[in-house]
Amino acid sequence: MGKGELELAGFILSEAFDEKAEKEKVEKEKALKEKTEKEKAEKEKAEKEKVEKEKAEKEKAAKEKAAKEKAEREKSKSAVSPATTNQNSNKGNVEKGVAIGVLAGGAVTGVAVGGAYLADKYIASKAAGAAVNVIELTPIPNAANTANNAAAVSQGSHRWQPLPYYLFNI
């Protein structure tokens, strides 16, 4: 073998080794890249699961809080006594009674329709100078109309006289 042939064989071998080293380098880079991508995907998946878990816990806590508040509201509703409920509804009855009674011309002090709530105490606090203390839902004639009303009742009808304009504080 001549010198030129040896150089050529050495060159071919070095090229083969270089090619092999290049292939190994590319494979290592590819494996490293795949490993990095896999770790990144696992990390993202773990982060996503963590976020979903936190979200589920927050929703669960919100539902429990809402249920607790609802139970407390129901409990407080049931704690209101029937007397208080009647009292509140009687306030509305008193106001209706005043309106109906003033228009019909009857005024009387006493207990409002509906029972337990003393209407004169309620109206006295709301009256602000009004002449009428309490009006029942069933109008009672004022003194000026008593005779006319008695005659009308005896005839089978109940006719009311109009109220004087000065009672309305216009």
UniProtKB/Swiss-Prot annotation:
Q: Where is this region: Disordered?
A: 20-95
Main subcellular location of this protein, as a coarse class: membrane
Q: Polar residues compositional bias: what residue ranges?
A: 78-92
This protein's membrane topology, according to the annotation, is: Single-pass membrane protein
Q: Which domain of life is it from?
A: Eukaryota
Give me the stretches of Basic and acidic residues compositional bias. Answer: 20-77
A single cellular component GO annotation: membrane
State the compartments where it is located.
Membrane
**Residue ranges of the TM segments:** 98-118
Keyword tags: Coiled coil, Membrane, Transmembrane, Transmembrane helix
Coiled-coil parts of chain? 15-81
Q: What is this protein's record name?
A: Putative uncharacterized transmembrane protein DDB_G0293028
